[in-house]
């Protein structure tokens, strides 16, 4: 299976500025099988024409709170949360095929039915695929911080993204974000504070009424090995 045959190939939807880098990666035979056999069940095909907005109740076969995770990597956090919360439905967006393949294999192994995957740009997913006020939560764990100043425009959390995110969240929804890069943490906190859509961020490590509920991710473990402080907040969506 080559990159042109992959479902939801992100190259088919150009963007002026991407917040991610398309890394080359080889699919294992197991991942190739997962994309061929499991994607039709758990994957969401890329939109065509004007028919892209999804009926999420039809997609999952029920009505339930929905959580979107952007940049799921190999799906560790997404699947851990989905397994612990069978009363919720989980959507994951990832542009790298090996990560999607691994996640599909784990969905099969764990017997999960409350997970669906996009293999396309998450901004496009939010803008084109999801109805307004359809998400109970949005998760963004350890996004690329784009360290160099000339690349800061590529950071995902910018005012237009926050406006889009607020439109897709329910009035009692939340944004759960974590990073190991302090300058990006300051940037995220500043953008959210001035947006008018979110309340003060809650540190799940210091709140008895809130729990992170996510496992240690590969990028977080790397940050810890390098001595980076972990910054994590849950921002409640303010009612309109």
Please tell me what each predicted stretch does.
Residues 135-155:
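A short SAM/SAH-binding and catalytic strip from SAM-dependent methyltransferases
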Residues 186-240:
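Class I S-adenosyl-L-methionine
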């Amino acid at each position: 299976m080559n990159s042109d045959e992959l479902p939801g190939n992100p190259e088919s939807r150009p963007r002026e500025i991407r917040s991610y880098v398309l890394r080359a990666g080889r699919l294992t035979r197991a991942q190739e099988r997962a994309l061929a056999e499991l994607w039709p069940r758990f994957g969401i095909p890329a939109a065509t024409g004007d028919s892209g907005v999804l009926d999420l109740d039809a997609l999952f076969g029920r009505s339930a709170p929905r959580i979107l995770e952007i940049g799921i990597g190999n799906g560790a956090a997404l699947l851990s949360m989905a397994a612990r919360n069978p009363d919720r439905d989980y959507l994951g967006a990832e542009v790298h095929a090996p990560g999607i393949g691994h996640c599909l294999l784990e969905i099969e192994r764990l017997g999960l039915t409350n997970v669906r995957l996009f293999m396309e740009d998450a901004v496009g997913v939010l803008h084109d695929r999801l109805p307004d006020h359809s998400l109970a939560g949005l998760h963004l764990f350890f996004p690329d911080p784009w360290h160099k100043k000339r690349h800061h425009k590529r950071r995902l959390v910018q005012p237009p993204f926050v406006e889009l995110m607020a439109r897709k969240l329910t009035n009692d929804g939340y944004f759960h974000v974590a990073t190991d890069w302090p300058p990006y943490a300051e940037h995220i906190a500043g953008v959210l504070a001035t947006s008018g859509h979110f309340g003060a961020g809650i540190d799940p490590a210091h709140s008895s009424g809130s729990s992170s509920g996510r496992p240690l991710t590969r990028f977080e473990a790397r940050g810890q090995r390098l001595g980076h402080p972990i910054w994590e907040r849950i921002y409640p969506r303010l009612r309109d």
